[in-house]
Each structure stands twice: as structure tokens, then as C-alpha cells.
Curated annotation (Swiss-Prot):
Protein EC: 2.7.7.6
Name of the protein described by the UniProt record: DNA-directed RNA polymerase subunit beta''
Family to which the UniProt record says this protein belongs: Belongs to the RNA polymerase beta' chain family. RpoC2 subfamily.
Organism: Gossypium hirsutum
InterPro entries for the chain: DNA-dir_RpoC2_beta_pp (IPR012756), RNA_pol_beta''_euk (IPR050254), RNA_pol_Rpb1_3_sf (IPR042102), RNA_pol_Rpb1_4 (IPR007083), RNA_pol_Rpb1_5 (IPR007081), Rpb1_funnel_sf (IPR038120)
Gene3D superfamilies per UniProt: 1.10.132.30, 1.10.150.390, 1.10.1790.20, RNA polymerase Rpb1, domain 3 (1.10.274.100)
Localization per Swiss-Prot or TrEMBL: Plastid, Chloroplast
Cofactor remark: Binds 1 Zn(2+) ion per subunit.
Gene Ontology BP annotations: DNA-templated transcription
Amino acid sequence: MAERANLVFHNKVIDGTAIKRLISRLIDHFGMAYTSHILDQVKALGFQQATATSISLGIDDLLTIPSKGWLVQDAEQQSLILEKHHHFGNVHAVEKLRQSIEIWYATSEYLRQEMNPNFRMTDPFNPVHIMSFSGARGNASQVHQLVGMRGLMSDPQGQMIDLPIQSNLREGLSLTEYIISCYGARKGVVDTAVRTSDAGYLTRRLVEVVQHIVVRRTDCGTTRGISVSPQKRTLPERIFIQTLIGRVLADDIYMGPRCIAIRNQDIGLGLVDRFRAFRTQPISIRTPFTCRSTSWICRLCYGRSPTHGDLVELGEAVGIIAGQSIGEPGTQLTLRTFHTGGVFTGGTAEHVRAPFNGKIKFNEDLVHPTRTRHGHPAFLCYRDLYVIIESEDIIHKVAIPPKSFLLVQNDQYVESEQVIAEIRAGTYTLNLKERVRKHIYSDSEGEMHWSTDVYHSPEFTYSNVHLLPKTSHLWILSGGSYKFSVVPFSLHKDQDQISIHYLSAERRYISRFSVNNDQVRHNLFSSDFSDKKEERIYDYSELNRIIGTGHCDFIYSAILHENADLLAKRRRNRFIIPFQLIQDQEKELMLHSHSGISMEIPINGIFRRKSILAFFDDPRYRRKSSGITKYGTLGAHSIVKREDVIEYRGVKKVKPKYQMKVDRFFFIPEEVHILSESSSIMVRNNSIIGVDTPITLNTRSQVGGLVRVERKKKRIELKIFSGNIYFPGERDKISRHSGILIPPGTGKTNSKESKKLKNWIYVQRITPTKKKYFVLVRPVTPYEIPDGLNLATLFPQDPFQEKDNMQLRAVNYILYGNGKPTRRISDTSIQLVRTCLVLSWDQDNKSSFAEEVCASFVEVRTNGLIRDFLRIDLVKSHIFYIRKRNDPSGSELISDNRSDRTNKNPFYSIYSNARIQQSFSQNHGTIHTLLNRNKESQSLIILSASNCFRMGPFNDVKYHNVIKQSIKKDPLIPIKNLLGPLGTAPKIANFYSSFYPLITHNQTSVAKYFELDNLKQAFQVLNYYLIAENGRIYNFDPCRNIFLNAVNLNWYFPHHHYHHNYCEETSTIISLGQFICENVCIAKSGPRLKSGQVFIVQADSIVIRSAKPYLATPGATVHGHYGETLYEGDTLVTFIYEKSRSGDITQGLPKVEQVLEVRSIDSISMNLEKRIEGWNECITRILGIPWGFVIGAELTIVQSRLSLVNKIQKVYRSQGVQIHNRHIEIIVRQITSKVLVSEDGMSNVFLPGELIGLLRAERTGRALEEAICYRAVLLGITRASLNTQSFISEASFQETARVLAKAALRGRIDWLKGLKENVVLGGMIPAGTGFKGLVHRSRQHNNILLETKKKNFFGGEMRDIFFHHRELFDSCISNNLHDTSGRSFIGIEFNDS
């Protein structure tokens, strides 16, 4: 009883850990037997008390946490604000997703932490509370789902579903929540079956690869090892111990002079502790990788058996054990037992908070601005940063680790508990990160704009994928495009206003073309792809009625459907204006599908005076047949200018043009066939044939006449001259006339009746033999050349254009020299005469005009149609701003310039009507031109994509000074402000717009110094006007809907009247073309604007074309071209971002499988196969061919094996599954043990492309004494199991019929070495007890001795070369040349292979 008094009385709730402690103390005191007796009594007591308490779980015991309501409400409020930010374009979709996930995750976690205090206060003996904290059943996070909120779920792929389940299981789920819950629940209703079968199939494939691996020897005699260093703490302690225990040493280990462990000794805990204590040199251990055979393994390379802790027994089927060990956790873990039913758990960042109110100070050089993962502005610090918080009397110093975000600015005042920095969650979440792509799709249709330069990503140079260099917005400018294919002529000009009724009326006259560009889907015109290419007939009667009888020289766009000139379009700086001639006089339409004006700009974009601007191929001078051009004895001089050098894909071609001084020339047709040497010709030289005579087997003549056959280099030229043959009487008379043109009206020289000729003829003398000759009279087509087709009339005249400034001279060039033959290629036609426009200008005013001018194409695009303008700058600019490829500062300034090298696709360029004359009017400045200092006023035109406007000359001094001042400060300012779609004209008298019919007031400043009086003096036109074709000016109501050239825009008009005192603090300038995000305040009491682009600015109102911004961060990929029309649902951007995975094996299994099947996991990760190719090439280059292959393959295989083992282990460890390395090593050894015979050195033994075992390749090479070239290759497990040596095993795995048929054709032999083959055939498996007989038999029969001539050839030479690389290369050295029973033979055991 005295003892009883000394006992301590505990009155405490006892939980799992306390019970453990109690039991261990009981065992120490009383031993096992007595303890078990005591525990039985405890158990009985427990049951008795539980019965008495009648603890049961009822639904009433699930108490919801009272704070849940407002916590959820708060989270919803935050989500709403986030949604708004996304709508305004402040954060992009990925940032929004991340932030919303973290908001809900934090809410859910907070609720979980609230749960315990809540139970403790309200009901400490609540059965649910007792159960969840006893450790007996259930844990806090499961109970949290019952009484807190279920939270975020992950779908079967482990992706987060960003809609959280707000209810808990006590309240019950809504329908949506239930479906989401099914995805993520344990034994999930949605995906368990699929997962389990996946895991089973993985196990099956793994076992298939390694089923034949059995322990067959005690020691294979290898000298290699893999070194593990205890000094470099790259591995965590636990993993280091796991790696060593149970392995066998490959080398002796010395500590100074003393040997502390010998080769082939297995490592136990004691040895590991000594290694760790002594920090010895790297320890070399044997692993399955070092074992010398691929078809079995020896005891020492395998090490200890995991079951009984001793060296593995002979005959143990370690392959199957390895396959099962890797596959089995997969089957277990698919059930999602790991986490509570797929509920998302991720790490959020730690926050550093300010301890008291004060001012922040830090070194600004150590940080640089960035965006946080949620899109907030922050500073990123590179190294440890000390932040000092100063208040009046206290100074506090906070150390912030590198790679953290600082959320405050220098000298900012912070309040107590304000978050000043965010420390990224530590390494424990690193293995739960993965990189994924997310595509963002467009919500509305419209036109694409971006506000910064973009790069082409290198692998997509010619497509529409661009990379963003910095954070910027992508804008989708709203506007529905009217889908007619192509407008064959366009009466409305760019930015006219038309009513919808007119559009629908016009649609009937539009023919639909089907255009298919196989590279990119162009939305230039929605095309009807019809299967039959049917020619459509235009209804021209209607068309004529529309055009009317007036001034009918139109050039209108038509798409060349199938046109030879498309080739010309593909050259960089050449554009074609296809047009049809409408001849007004005869009221008939001559339609030539091939006619068009082609303009060509020199590569550098500089025209000299008198250079050719454009050329026009007149269809009248086009021939379908070959022939010779003649223009008699009249003089012609050929001109070749520098501008005519066409650079096409880097090859320069100089094409001479012949300028004619004559008014006519002659074309003598002939039929030409160019045949290859080998073709058999069915007609003789100088014979006369009729029409449709077969010439060769598959060609027939199209005309009749005389045949001439000439043999040139490697080809035969066969000509057929049509015409009549005369045999002249007197020889000398004809010789004078040989090869001349005879005009009509003269008599024939050699005929009796002197008949007058009606047409021109060409007389040619032909002598088939020396004595015999005759004359061939050939028909001639004469061509008249007028004094030049006056192309100037094709363009409507600009009434205010100064005619004497820019001159266009039309000159006719003949393209073929006198007597030069013209050749027709396949089905194209030959152009004989080209009419060229020669550009020149007056040089009266020396100051303003230069010898050279800059020219460039500007593409202006309105939805559905592209317009290209030629821009010629006559003004000598003082300041040049030339766009560089990645210069961000000019991003808003530079229009989309066609002469720019960094261009997009110039293949389709459609010219619109009446554009070119505009380019020649006086003084067109460009974006290159700033205000010219020596003139009073200067006009400036900027054509940017789909935004065109023109600033006229400013005569008003006040306004001019403002601009001058701003130029002095920053010369780029005025251009920024002036960029915009519509223009201004101070005086209508000196500016007539032929293709900007909308003239608007340009810019209204809201600044104080810009008062309305000044504005009225500067700009007399305050409303905008429409100028009709005949020069009348219409003023119209600004509130009407405005349509941009077949594009329906959504307009938004804020009306507000400015007052003088109205904006004293703010001095915002609204400029044309500016993009405005939603809710930006322009002025204090001004309206809140919707997002869009400012289109028209007036004194009292602005018009905004509504647009939707999408934010994109650096590294994002933009799809589509600038200015392209996008439709709803098109892909806009692709982001690549890191995200937390839910810590669940749902990702584990696919990942393991991807590694084992050697598939690239995603486009970003390094692909192992690529790495292997690189290794192979480098080593071979360094060491030359034979050694390079041996060593290259060895090194590659060693590298990739270690890499693969680490990858697989990483996946399993992240799921908390411990698998011993040696199991993975056995599998990896099988998938890396094959090499691919390459074609570099052709050997007699193996075919190129054959897969053979690495050791077999080495041994064959030694036996043949010649190098076999091979390179390492990674097989996936499926391929490896279909490339084993046993066809029975392969056939039982997959593709049975194929494998058996192949084996039968090749006559393959199965040696029945694996387990599976023997099971299939009902034999005894060669493992366990059935193992001994196999070895005994093979020793007797399979030792075939081959005599070798050079005994020590390999041993000596290789040792000299590679003695210092012993660890890696000694596989190929002496040990393979073991002596059998004293004679010099090499024993090759075929059961090894």
C-alpha cells in the first residue's frame, strides 16, 4: 500500500501520443508479457467507459463555425474586386486564377484553425471533437470538411477547379458543388476505375521489361562503381543513408593509411555511421548499373535482399520484385487516400508585417520593379535586403531573404501590421510546382492591336506566333465585320460613313471568291470554300448601273484567283494592283484577269530621281506562244539601273530593259519544244509536218511547218516554223533578203505575178545542204506602241494638288532584245511590252527636295480589306527616327511600315481605288519628319494601321509655339499626341481630302493653359464634316451610328462641356488614337469612360471605339497578326506559368509513366532524348570515330541512367512513397541497355538502325577487331518489352500476331531464359529451385571457344589511352579478357547476352 501512495494521480485527457509514451515506459519497467496484460485491461476499461458515456456520432454534433458566414462573404467580395480588375485589364487570367485560388485557400485554412477553439469553448466533449483530436480516426482536415467548408477541389488531372465548394457536408452541397465534389472525392465517382487500370497496366509493362532478370551468379567480376560522396551534402541525410545501406562496396576505402572497409563488403548501419563521421573520400558502390550482364544480375551488384537483410539468394527473381515495387504504390495511391479526397492543399506565401507605424527605408539599388504572381506592383530583391522602419523613437530592422517581394516603396509611411514584404514559401513546395500553358480566348470579335513591339519566336519565324518582351495590353477593337468575300469594287472609301441598308443592297452584286492560303488562316475575307472550282459569271448589267456613266476610270480591287502574278507578290517589296479596265466609250467590260500595275520598291526604300516607280503589263502585248521579237534596224539602247536589281531570297538577278524609240515592233511566232537528251524524237530535222503531228511519245505539234532540231548542252531544242516555202530561182537576190521583214504593199521578188502583200511577212533563208536552199516566208504580228499609255488618267485628279511638283512619265520598255527569242514556260503567257511609270520631281526649291526620296508601303487595314498606300517623302527630314526591332520607346510612334524588314506576311496586298495619286501630292511628310526648322509651317501625315489622319499646316502662332516648346523638351511628344485615326483641317480651302472624308478637330486639351479662345483661333473647324465626291460639304449629326468601311463599330459618346475653371489640377490631354482603360478619370467631374480607343475629339465631346483590353506579361505568346480580325473564341495569348499541384498521386502516376516511357513531359522541360543526341555528337567529335562511339555511348548511358532514377524517385518521394533505388535501377538498366547501330561505319555484322545490347556490341567489336558505330538510345518501357530476346514473351505482351509472324519470317530462336516464356510453355521457371539445373546445363554446352590472333591487343592499347578514366571506362579492359584454364582463349558465353 505504501507503493500505492507514491503513485501520481493524472487527471488528463489521454490521446494517441500519451498512450505511446505510457506503453514504452511500461515495457521498460515490466517487460513485454506484463505490459500486454496491462494493455488488455486498459482496452476493457476504454470500451466499458465508452459504453457508459454512449458516445455516438449524430448529425447534431456537427457544429458549424459561427464565423464562417462573414469569412465566405469576405472572400466573395475579394473575388468580385478581382473580377473587376481583370475586366479593366489590370490583371490577366492566370494571375486572376492564382489569386482567387489563394483567397479561397486562405479562407478554408482559417476556418480549419477556427474549428478547434470553437469546439473547445462551446462543447469540449463533442464526439466529433474528441474523435478528430484523439488520433484514433479522422483528422482535422477531414472534420473541417464536415463542419467548415469543403474548399477547393482538384480534377482528375490534378488541375485546380477555381470554383470552391463553400458548403460543408453538414449543410449539404448544391448540385454544382456535388458534381465538382465527385471529381475530387476519394474513390472519386468520376475517375477511380480509370486510374486503377492505368496503374495496373503500368505494373504489367514494368514486369514485362524485367521478368527475365534473376540472380544467377555470386560475382560478375566488374571493377566499376558509382561514387557517392559523403562530403558534398547534395543529398539530404535520410536519402544518403538509404542509398548506402544494403549496397556492396566496389573499392577499398581508406582513412589515411588505414583501410576501414574492403571491396565486396556489404554496407550496414555501422559502416554508414563511420563514413559519416570520418567524411571519407567518395565511396564507390556497386549497383545493378555496374553489373556486366543485361540478362541477369549477380548477388554483389544487387546487394542485400530487402526482406531478410542478407545478401540476396541465388535464383531470386529480382526483376519481377522490382517491377511490382514500382507499380504497386500506383494502384494504392490512385484511390487518393493520401489527401482527403483530392482537396487542394498548397503553400501560400509568408508575410512580413510592420511592427509599428513608421517610415520605410531600404537600398533601392538592390531591388528592381516587377509584378507579383497576383499582378500587383512590387520590388524583387536579388540578395538579402535590410529594411529599416523608423518611427519617432524606435528604429526596427527587418532582414528580407533573396527572391522575396517588397510590397512598399522607399520612404513610404506604413501602418502597424501592414504587409511590407512577401517571402516565397520555402523549398517544401518546390517539388509541387509544375509549368503549364494556359490559352486565353477572345470574348468578342474585333480587330487586334497591341501596344508594344513583339518578337517573332525563332521557331515560328514565318507564322503568326509572337513573343512579348514586356508587360503590355492586347486590345480587341470592337466591330463586326460584314462577311462578304471580296468587294470587287469599292464605292465607299476608307472611313466613309454608310448606312447598313446600303450594305445589304450592295451585297447582291458581290461575287464570292474562294481563296485558300495554306499557311495562315487569313480573315481578310470570309471565303466560301467550294469543292468545285467553278468560274462564276459576273452580273455586269447590274454593275454598270451602279457605276453609272460618269468618270469611269476605276482601279478597283479584285483578288487574283489563280494567277501567275502571285509569285511576284511573294517578293518582299513588290506589290501588284490588280485591276480591270472598264472602257467607258464602248460600254463594254474588257476583263483581263492578269492585268495589274506592279509597284516595286528598292530594298533600302530609297528612290533616285528618274527611277521606275511602277510598271503596267498591258494585256494587249501579251502572247501565249513563243517567238522572236524584231524591230528592224532601228536603234535601241538597253538600260539597266541599280533599282532593277531584284533581290529575291538573296540571289541577285539583273534583268535588262530595252527602251524603244520606235512606235511599233513585230512578233514572229514559232513553236518551241525543249526536250531532254534521252527523249526519242519522231520527226527529222528540216522536215515539214502538219498540225497535230506526234513529235515525241506524248507531245504533238500545235502548228504545221518546218522542223528545226538543235542540240544544246544536255537538252534538245525543237522549233517548228509555220509559213510557206518558196524555192527561189536566183540565189544572190535572195541572200540580201535573208532574214528581213517585208512590209505589205510590196510585190514578191521571185514570183511571176507580182501580187501585193496584205500583211507583213518575215523572209528567212534556209540551207539544209550546201547546194540546196529555200526560203521560208513566215507570218508576222505587228504591234503598235502608242506614245505611252497615259496611266495618270487612271487616278482621279486631286483638285488641290500642285501639278508641277511630282512628275510621272510613262515610258514603254520592250522586254526582249532585237532578234532575241522569247520562251514561254508551261502555261504562262509572255509579256512583250511593259509600260513603266518613271518618277521625277522638280528641283526648283533646293532646300526642300533631295536627290533621293524615301518610299515605303503602308498597309492600312480596315476589317475585311487591306489597303496599301505608297508613301513618298519629298521632305528632307532633320530628325530621323528609324524603327529598331526591339526598341520599346518607339512603340506608339511607328506605323506598320511595309519596307520594314521585321514584317509580317506581305503575301496578300489588295490595293484599293484611287490611292496612288495621294502619294504624289506636295510635301508629304511621314513619321520620319518632325517640324522643319527653316519653314514657317509644315504638314505631317502619319498612316498607322487602320488609323489615318493628316495634320495640315499650322499658321496660328500660339498653337505653333506650344508644339515648338514641347519639341525642345522631347522631340517625340507631338507625334505621340498626333497619332490617331482621323485628321484635322484648320482651313478647308487649303486641304481637300480625297480619301479621308471625315475631317475632325484633332485634339482637345484639358490643360489650363489651353483655353477655348486659343482653340477657336487655331482651329476654325470644330465639328466634323463629310466631303462628298463632288466637293459639297455635309455637316451631320454626331450621334448617328458610324460605320467604318463595312465594319459595325460600337460607338460611345460622352458629351461634356469644358469650362475654363474646370480642370485646374489635372492637365490630361486626350489625344486621338489613345487607348483608355475603363473607369479612367479624365477630369474631376468628367464622366467615367468605357475602355476603348479615342476616335474623334471635339470641343465638347469625344467618340470612343469600344475595345477590350487583355493584359499579357513577358514571355507570353501572342497568336495572330497586328490588325487581324479575330472572331469570338479565337486564341489570343498563351501564358506559361508555374502552378502548385495538389499533393496527390493523381499527378504521380502519369508523371512516372511519362518518365518511364521517355516522353517529354511538357514543351518546356528538357527532353532526355535530345540530351542524349547532344552527348553522342560531342564525344564523337572529340575522340574520333571508333573510340568516340564506344565512350560516347558509355558516358551517355551513365548520364541518362542517373538522371532517370532521380526523376522517378522525385515523383514518388513527393507523394511520400519510399521505394529503394535498386528497384528503379533494374528497370532503368533495361530501358537504357540497347544501342542503335548507326550508318557512319558500316559493319558486316549488324544492319544500320538495328537495336542491339550494349555489351553485345562491345564484345562483337572486340571479336571482329573492327569498330562498330553505334549510339545510345532511350527506349520506353513499351518499346523495351517489345525488343527482348524472347519472341514468346513479346507475343504474350502485345501485338501477338505481328510479333509471331515476324519471328517466323526471320526464323528466330527463343532460348527460354526468362520466366514468362517457360510459364507460357508450361516448363519449370528458371528461378528459385528451378535455377540450379539451368546453370549446370549452360556451363557444359554453351562455352564455345574462339581463338584470337592478337591476345593482348585491347588490354594494352586501351589501358594506355584511358588509364586516367578508370572509373568510367574500364568495362572494356582486361577483365573481359579472362583466361580460361591457362590457354590464351577468349571465352564468350552466349548465355551472357
